[in-house]
Every structure is written in structure tokens, then in C-alpha cells.
Amino acid sequence: MVREILARVLKKITAKPGVTIAVVLLVGPLGFLFSCAYFSPDIPFLFHHSGAFWIRFPEPVSAYIRGYTDRVHFAKDFYLDQDPGSPIWVHLKAFREFKLYINENPVTAESPPGKNWKKGVKIEISPWVKSGRNSIRTHVENPMGPALLWLRIEGLKDLIATDETWKARIESSPWVQAILADDTRANPDSLSVPTSYQYIRKKGTTIFWIFAASVGLWGIGGFFFHGRREEILIKVASAGIIMGWVYLFLAKMIRIGPAIGFDISHHLDYILFILEKRAIPLASDDWATFHPPLFYLLSFGVLEIFKPFYSIFRPFHLLKVIPFLSGLGNVWVAYAIGRVVFKDDPFRLLLVIIVAGFIPMNIYLSAYVGNEPLHAFLAGCSLVMAVHIFRSPEVKVFHMIYLGLFLGLAVLTKITAGVLVPVVVIFLAYKMIHVDRKDLKGVASRLGFFILIMTVVCGWYYIRNITHFGRPFMINWNLPGQLWWQDPGFHTLQYYLSFGEALRHPYFSAFHSFWDALYSTFWGEGLIGGKALMAKRPDVWNYDYMSAVYLFALPATGIFLLGLLKAVQMALKNTDPNSKLIITFLIISFYSVALFIWLSTLKVPIYGQAKAFYCLAAMGPISVFGALGFGVVREWLMPSHYIALRALFYGWLGTLLTFIYLSYAG
């Protein structure tokens, strides 16, 4: 029976190769990540099990970088009334190095199998145990995170295992109560400002008037949706967004000094290195020099070109031009993808423009000097080119040139764009084989030419890395000679299953969970410009409005998810092979970038690693999902008896968009 079911399933899967590819691309990476989290010693992912818990010293939560080896002693006394009559064993796991003492006698232990700390060791301690009072002490050292211990004693009448009854101390300091290893502890500094709800109450009158004005504009604007006036609104919305962005740049972004921004000092050091030495640094030369060089070379070029005009333009202001134009370019990328997806639906194209123009993470990140906006723009251009290829009746040589150029430049800006390369290759191959019915020789020649162009553009840099370091990809979690960590330094399942802190205390809510981190950095400056204290947050933004956005945006988040589900439905039910291919490609591209963020949080388990703007390369697909979701809600509210709900919906939407803009312009 089971064989027959499996045979039918396999027959259906092989009959639809597109579905097979999508399933493999979705499920395969998930299985890989789960396997790494459970088995790999390079992934500090912890499981409490068998009645024992991982414990740690009660160090206060901090946003500062820690550049030291954590050394902690853990101890517990236990009593033995009589000889247990059987061997006594200690099953021990330590993150990462340990020394074990029973009654202050050192106990020699072999390294875990394959030196994998997750497997732990099992040590017989019977020779050192005596009747009466006994003590067990473990000294744990970890240069890449907090010192953690998991231990249970087997062979006794009662279970003795690590929990909150154990004592802990650092070196010769007094013994204190150990705490459970918890990666969801809040940063106390996040509690130093009012909650989002308190900010909403503070802005109650403003909310009322903006809501009323939004309902009025909806009523007046309904007139423009008779006939074919959507095209006019598309032009008006595009012009309005451009003017709004230009105002933000001239009035706000230009005022942000060189002390504000994510890793800003290191980005500036990279540019300064090129200015002074006229050379590209090695990945090990400084904190941020592991990044590919394109953004820094372009910044160097801008400074050199405008050097005679330094009396008019401040050099630091010039460095803001590339991130700003890239951020505005990301809005264009979303529009360009929307034109392909919604070629016969101007209303949803209008929604794409509005969604893209108001995504908060794109707005605030474009104000800071860094490589992320440029990387997102170039990766977005690659997606634009790809969807145009999928819409075209034939894959041509010039398509491969442009696609290879854009994707090569994106990978030369940041390695994250590399996750799109296999996705693009797989979908190009599917397009040519199953849609265009090309022979394998033609497919191989096109794909080979695309890879050649991309390699010519960016390959030299990665060959240089191989020459110096023995590997092409240098990322901040494996740089030679750099040992550092930040809280929490490890992760548990709870971190990936929790959510809610971003709705109460959004700033630094990234300490609480993966989803709080993404939510707080998508809808606002949840990590306050890379600063470690609320008192040092960027003073150009309006945090009254920004804090209120976090609650107002909760329905919008649901609408984005609804749009993603709608996209999946379109991918499954669309009968046009090119349209099906495009929407599936957008879903998988978004999924790949999001999965890379998840992997990075496993590899680098620090509070600031889960940032929504690492998904900025997928802003085009995100905007399409948003447009699909808002379009579905609009259709639900179309019946005339829902007029009150429609007024409520558009009043809320207008208030949300206004508050988002005032967060940065107010």
C-alpha cells in the first residue's frame, strides 16, 4: 500500500518538473539548515534535553562587542548516602573547552568524537566519588561566545543535572546562581523609552485628523478610478515618491553625521584605505574589508571626481549620494518587475509603486554610508532582467550579457547576491528546456556565456581571495585573526518561535527573537542606526511616529503574507508557462535571500545579525507580494454593503503611510 502511494506521488512529481524543482529548492535548503543546526559544531544552536539544561553565568545583556574569552566555573554539591553499586558517569557538553573536577580532583577526559562539542563526552567518575558530601566543578572557556555547560550525572538514585540550582563564578569572583542559557533575554535599554501603545495614545489627536483626511481622500480619489485613470495615478504616485525622497535627502539624510550608520566607521576606513594606498585591501586588513570592493571603489571615484569642489560639497555628503540613489533605484526595480507581473493590471502596478516607495527599511538604510543599498539595487536589476527574459519568447545572447553584468556587479558588491546565482541558473535552464524547447547544446551555450560574463566581472576578486586565504568567500564569521562576539552568542529553538516584543518595545527587540528582529528592522529603525545605546540613536528621525508605526503595521504584515500566499496560488494555477515561471522565480528568489539570513543567524548568533534589510535585494518580489495582498483585500471590500469597512481600511492605510513618512520627515 505504502509503495503504491509513493509510486503515485513520484509519478505526479516527475510529470511536473517545475513543481519538482520548486519543491527541491524549498525543502532541500531547509533540511540542510536543520541538519547543520543539530549536528554541526560550527553552529552554536543548543537543545535542552534529557532533564538537563544549558546554563551560563548571569552576565547582563549588552549591545557592545565582546573581544575576550569567556571563562566561567560551574559547581554543584551533591550527597551520596551509600555506595550506588554501579558505575557513576558524567555526560557532559561544554561550549566550548572544559576541565572537570570531582571533589577538586582533576578528571581527564578525551575530546568529543570529531572534536564536536555537541556530541559531548561520557566520563566515569566512580573513583573520585565518596560517601557523604561531594562536589563537581567544571571550568568552561569560550573565545567565540559565552561559556555554557550541559551536564548530567548518571548512575545515582536521583538525577543530578545542570539547572538554576548550580553556582557560577568568573575567575575568583564570588559564587552566584547560574541561569539557564536563554537567547531571548531583553536588553534593558529597550525599556528606557515608552511603548508603542503609549506613543499612539500620545498622538491620538493627530491620528484622528490623519485618519479623517485619508478617508476623505479615498472618497475623492474614487472618482479617478472610473475609466482608465489608473495610469494618471501611477504617474502622480511616482512623481510624489521621487519628490518625497528628494526632500528626505536634502532635509534629513544629509544631516546625519559620520558617527551614525551600521558599521559606519569601518565602511569609511575601507574607503580611506583606497584613497591613501590606491589599492584594494585584503579581507584581513580591517573589520569591513572582507566585503567585495565595488561600492568602495565607486565611492572613491565620486570623491576623486568632486575633489576640486570640496569647498562646495563636504566629502562625507558626497558619499551619501550612492546609497540614496540606490535606495530610490530599488523603488524603480520594484516598478519594473511590477510592470512585467501586472502588465494588464495598472491598479496593482500602482500598489507596487506605493508599497516600494514607503518600505521603511529602504528609506532609513539609504540615509547611511554602506554597501547594502547598492548591492540591493544591482541584485534587483538582475531580477528585472531575469523576469524580462522569462517573459520573452526566446533567450537571446544580449539577455545573457546584461544578466551576467548585473549579477556579477551585485556579487562584486556583496556576497549575499551569490545566493541568487543558482536560482537564476536553474530557472534559466527550465525556461530554455521546458518552455522554449531548446536542445541541450543551446542551453549549455547560453548558460555558459552567462556564467562567463559574470565571472569576468567579479571572478578576479574571488580568485584573489583564493590566492591569499585558500578560499573564495570571506565572511565576517570566519575572518583570520579576528575574534569577537556579541550577545547572545548562541541560539535556541525559542529564539525562532517567539514574537511580540517588537509590538511593545521595538528598539533592540532583536534580542528577543528572530521574528521580532525582522519586524523591528523592516518597519522602522529597530537597531537605531547601529548604535549600542538608545541615547545615541539618530536624532534626525521622529521616534514618536516611528514607534506608533510598529502597531499600525501589524495588519500590513498580515496583508504581505496574504500576498505571498496569493503568489503561491498563482504559481500553482497559472496556465501561462511564462507567467507561472516568473511568479515562481520571484517566490524562490525571496525565499533564497530570506534563507541566507536564517543561515547567517545560525552561523553568527548575535543580536544584530537578523536584519530585515538583508532582504533588500528581494525588494521587488516583496513589493509584488504587498500589491497582491492589498489587491485581495480591495476585492474583498468591493461589495457596496462593505462601505464602512472600506472607509476604515483606507483610513488606516492612509494613516500608516503618513506615519511612515513622518517617521523620517517629521
Label each residue range with its predicted role:
Residues 223-228, 390-391, 420-454:
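Perimembrane helix-loop-helix junctions
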Residues 82-102, 134-140, 175:
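Aromatic-lined ligand-binding clefts that engage carbohydrates, nucleic acids, or primary amines
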Residues 23-42, 230-264, 283, 449-467, ...:
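Transmembrane signal-anchor helices characteristic of membrane glycosylation enzymes that use polyprenol
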Residues 2-37, 202-250, 326, 442-453, ...:
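Start-transfer (signal-anchor) and selected internal transmembrane alpha helices
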Residues 215-226, 516, 523-580:
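Hydrophobic, aromatic-rich transmembrane alpha-helices
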Residues 219-224, 317-342, 381, 562-565:
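Transmembrane-helix motifs of polytopic, lipid-linked glycan transferases
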Residues 248, 265-290, 294, 302-307, ...:
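Extracytosolic helix-loop segments that constitute the early lumenal/periplasmic catalytic or substrate-binding loops
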